[in-house]
Amino acid sequence: MDVKIIWHGHACFSIEGKKNVLIDPFLTGNPMAKVKAEDLNPDIILVTHGHYDHAADAVSISKRTGAPVLSVFELSEIFKESGINTIDINPGGTVEFEGVSIKATIATHSSSYDGRYAGNPVGYVIDIGRKIYHAGDTGYFKDMELIGSVDRPEISLLPIGGHYTMDVDGAVEALKMLKSPIAIPMHYNTFDVIKADPLRFKNLAAAVGTYVIVPKVEEPVEL
């Protein structure tokens, strides 16, 4: 099945196939964003953790569209206070949503929402006709080998900006374990502290057998 991936900057993506899946909606306050939160009409919203640069527009988009917000239990309980439709999950769990399979994985990071503890961060493996792994904010970790061998994502969306997540070299180490044939970098160059060169990532990844696509913001990647 044809799938379209659109990078909205930072870690925010739309994945369009059987359904329109929006991940980590950070448009408001995102210096890379070329669209506004009100321009997006997802069927479901996935949030990897509660930090503002990943969850900023989740509530407003959900209220406007009725799309449920999927996140870990603790963050989901916070979202419920806004009166939106929520779905909770935890690492290892899988949610089936109207023909789309969404599995939560671990991630090595932290999570809070407006200063409140928001559970553990996660990544997601999304089966929407193609298997796509959004790692969330994370460093590389040994269990990526299991994600690679068990879930077998065809496309991995990986942070490369360093400081708060793995950097370019770390993302290449992740690819050695994931063995995805295609990768797309994220979480870089939004702010000075996460400056990174995606072309360096592309070149290093090629040496471990992964083709890296470096899209421009709002430039669709069709697979």
From Swiss-Prot:
**InterPro entries linked to this entry:** Metallo-B-lactamas, RibonucZ/Hydroxyglut_hydro, UPF0173, UPF0173_UPF0282_UlaG_hydrolase
Output the HAMAP family linked to this UniProt entry.
Answer: UPF0173
On whether Hydrolase is a keyword of this UniProt record, the answer is yes
Q: Origin organism of this chain?
A: Thermoplasma volcanium (strain ATCC 51530 / DSM 4299 / JCM 9571 / NBRC 15438 / GSS1)
Coiled-coil annotation reads none
Report the sequence similarity comment from the record. Belongs to the UPF0173 family.
Pfam families, sorted: Lactamase_B_3
Identify the SMART domains for this entry. Answer: Lactamase_B
- Protein name as catalogued: UPF0173 metal-dependent hydrolase TV0864
Annotated Gene Ontology MF terms? hydrolase activity
Give the keywords, sorted: Hydrolase
Q: Which Gene3D superfamilies match?
A: Ribonuclease Z/Hydroxyacylglutathione hydrolase-like
